[in-house]
Amino acid sequence: MLRLSSAVLIAAMATSTASAEGLYLGAGFASVNAEEPGYKYGSTNILGLIGYEVNDYLSLEGELSVAISKDKIRIASTNVEIGTEHMGAYAKLTLPTAGPIKPYARFGMARAEASATVGSTTVSVNDSAFSYGIGAEWELSEQTGIRLDYTAADYGVTDASVLALTSVFRF
């Protein structure tokens, strides 16, 4: 029974390969937030995305964001400007639906960098962590879509999250 179930699943995934396969690019905006004991901070970032649809169910993605607006927090009597940037590599698992809304989950590894500026001095720290999230894409056509996703990572002492709105273009 297990062999039959496995064979049916593999056959279903293989037949879907012809309908969804290829390169896609995305660009959008993200709200990147981090929380450490005693501090919360975030930034507004521009986001770039590159991915490859293996089939209707599986895609591989790379993502990069750069801060365009940083947060300001007060530590003791000093104002600190702080922002977070990230890059990640993900496997995206899509639930095929009959309509234009395609929900998905993704998981992978992310590397984040937080930089704090006081006056003319900037200090940066970076770390890598397992990252996971959920989202959905609204397919406007076979070539374009808009997606909204939430991704989280735990960097030990720091918890981080990314809420992104991205336009997707398929080739």
Over which residues does each language-model region extend?
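Cleavable N-terminal export/targeting peptides
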Residues: M1-G22
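Outer-membrane beta-barrel strand-turn architecture
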Residues: S19, G51-D56, L95-G99, R111, ...
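Residues on the lipid-exposed face of transmembrane beta-strands in outer-membrane beta-barrel proteins
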Residues: F29, G48-Y52, A89-L93, M109, ...
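Repeated loop/turn-to-beta-strand initiation elements of outer-membrane beta-barrel proteins
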Residues: L23-L25, Y57-G62, G99-P103, W138-L148
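Extracellular loop and loop/strand-boundary signature of outer-membrane beta-barrel proteins
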Residues: A34-P37, R74-V80, T117-S124, Y150-A153
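Predominantly the C-terminal beta-signal and adjacent terminal strand-loop region
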Residues: A67-I73, S128, W138-F171
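Residues that define the transmembrane beta-barrel architecture of outer-membrane proteins
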Residues: E21, G42-I46, E81-M87, S124-F130, ...
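Transmembrane beta-strands of outer-membrane beta-barrel pores
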Residues: F29-E35, T44, L64-K70, L95, ...
